[in-house]
């Protein structure tokens, strides 16, 4: 970054981090109790730590943060927006190669109910990375009946992605990571329904902030500002972030999602061996 107003020929070099670290910083997450979610092609759950933590099984990643004396912890799913795109391309045809728009699909999902009328979706369409490091993992719809329609399945896909994020959080809790607020980003954060599902499953407020839509690019701009002395530290850089949306947990559906999440968490341990067997080349002939 060239520092305008600085000595000629002097360049400021900003030390940042990988894509997720920068995106988390761009969402304003550096304090305890804050979680950051990214719903892009994959799904990310991230938080800041005051101290480095051991991660013996390697299912989470812990490394340096943008903020001084902070650490970054995250879990990454391979399936988020990619799962919705799979559903759209394969089951939402209209005519002449056209598909329902994502907005139309979400409208149908909104018309369904919390818990998708008793339908659960394991979103492991591309294998999985966290919380189950299993390249042979496969997706599944559990509880499908003749009464379920397009909107119910769409909602179960959206809920399954959020259940996967909440599954990651169960790995973070032993590290002392709390959840008071989620700061959402990524294309999926544009969906009011997807933000509300996060609030309901996690049981905490979900906000989006100005700049989060630009993701890592916005975070990189903040890092550049730090390098050029626009702000003295990371905390100062994010203190004026403005919330542009807020979703509160709906207590009326809290029990529905609590039970659904427990059922969701029970599925992979039971189905994992079968899903692995189904990845055998014999079924690809």
Name what the model sees in each region.
Residues 2-285:
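Active-site core segments that coordinate phosphate-bearing ligands/cofactors
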């Amino acid at each position: 970054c060239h520092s305008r107003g600085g000595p000629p020929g002097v360049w400021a070099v900003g030390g940042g981090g990988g894509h997720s670290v920068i995106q988390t910083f761009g969402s304003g997450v550096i304090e305890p109790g804050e979680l950051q979610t990214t719903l892009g092609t994959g799904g990310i759950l991230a938080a800041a730590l005051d101290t480095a933590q051991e991660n013996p099984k390697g299912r989470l990643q812990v490394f340096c943060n943008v903020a001084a004396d902070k650490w970054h912890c995250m879990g990454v799913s391979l399936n988020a927006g990619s799962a919705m795109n799979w559903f759209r391309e394969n089951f939402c045809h209209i005519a002449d190669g056209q598909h329902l728009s994502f907005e139309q699909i979400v409208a149908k999902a909104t018309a369904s109910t919390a818990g998708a009328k008793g339908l659960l979706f394991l979103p492991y369409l591309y294998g999985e990375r966290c919380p189950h490091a299993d390249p042979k993992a496969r997706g599944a719809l559990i509880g499908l009946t003749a009464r379920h329609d397009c909107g119910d399945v769409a909602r179960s896909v959206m809920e399954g992605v959020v259940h996967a994020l909440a599954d990651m959080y169960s790995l973070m809790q032993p590290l002392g990571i709390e959840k008071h607020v989620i700061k959402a980003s990524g294309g999926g954060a544009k969906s009011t329904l997807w933000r509300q599902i996060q609030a309901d499953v996690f049981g905490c407020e979900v906000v989006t902030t100005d700049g989060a839509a630009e993701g890592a690019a916005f975070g990189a701009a903040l890092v550049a500002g730090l390098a050029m002395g626009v702000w003295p530290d990371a905390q100062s850089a994010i203190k004026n972030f403005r919330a542009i949306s807020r979703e509160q947990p709906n207590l009326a559906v809290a029990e529905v999602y609590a039970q659904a999440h427990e059922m969701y968490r029970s599925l992979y341990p039971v189905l994992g061996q079968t899903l692995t067997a189904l990845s055998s080349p014999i079924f690809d002939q």
